[in-house]
Amino acid sequence: MKTTSASPILLLRAVGICFLAAIGAAQNVGPLEPPLPQARPPRAPQPRYRSMISIFDLRDRSIRTIYQADTVFEAPNWSPDGKYLLTNSGGRLFRISVNGPGNAAPEAVDIDSSLRLNNDHAPSPDGKMIAFSASSPASRGSQVYLANEDGSNVHVMVKETPSYFHGWSPDGKYLAYVYQHPAANGTPANYDIFRIPAAGGQPEQLDSNPGYDDGPDYSPDGKWIYFNSDRSGSWDVWRIPADGAGPGDEKAEQVTSDEWEDWFPHPSPDSKWLLFLSFAKGVATHNDKLPGTQLRMMPMPGARLAKPPKIQVLTTFFGGQGSINVNSWSPDSRRFAYVVYEPLPAAAAQ
């Protein structure tokens, strides 16, 4: 195909027309509008639950609900005199009568209102004091506190955050708690078990395994601390001597090792039973409330562990976080308290 060249006059004329058209277009364009702000995606609706504070009776395997509310109540403790439960809701601590007609109004414990309590709390063995975990505007993280039984004389026992109380020694001399070491030098954050004298003093670290350890609770004879850990690759119940696991945690002993994820072991006051919360295999944390959660029980281990332990299922329910985080046995070891949850229609976040 033969090509021809355009004349110089035609080219100049075409360039001029394009230039004039560009100027006219520019004159007709107004100022640039700022981009519209991107709308925030709507927040997910917040879960809501009905709480049923329940009592399980070992004698006949009956379950009685003593209080129900369409809000979250957590972690009931039985008072040493057997008359009431301590439970938390909305950052406050409450007493609920055990022997009332049912659904008696909770009575608030008058603790410093600037503190926001969580679900780790318990009365002392003599009933004169309450240990609890709470955050303050200054701390912005959970610390361990001690107060008189009526809520007065509040003072911080463990300033480091986050730290969570879990159990009294049976003689009332020590508080067992967990503290999260911050991540450092490539080592991830990690929870370990500590104790501190109830009269005040220096905390003592009781284990050193890099696993996540939680929920320490004393045996009634004061010789052992039972807790849950993922150090075996799944969540199981373990125990260590009350004065520590020794170098390399050489004295730590694994108590459970089946297909369930076990949390928050609680020895009965008569030393006959060990109660704990169990999630289905693969549930990574205790932070959720889930269907199919179980409360299981086994005979209290002796000096030597029986393998495998004889574990029985007491109840299967909708529960988890808040159901039984701290010891909730009755003083006579015949009953224990726990919280059953029922999902409610979700409310949109404000």
What does each model-found stretch correspond to?
Residues 13-23:
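Bacterial N-terminal signal peptides
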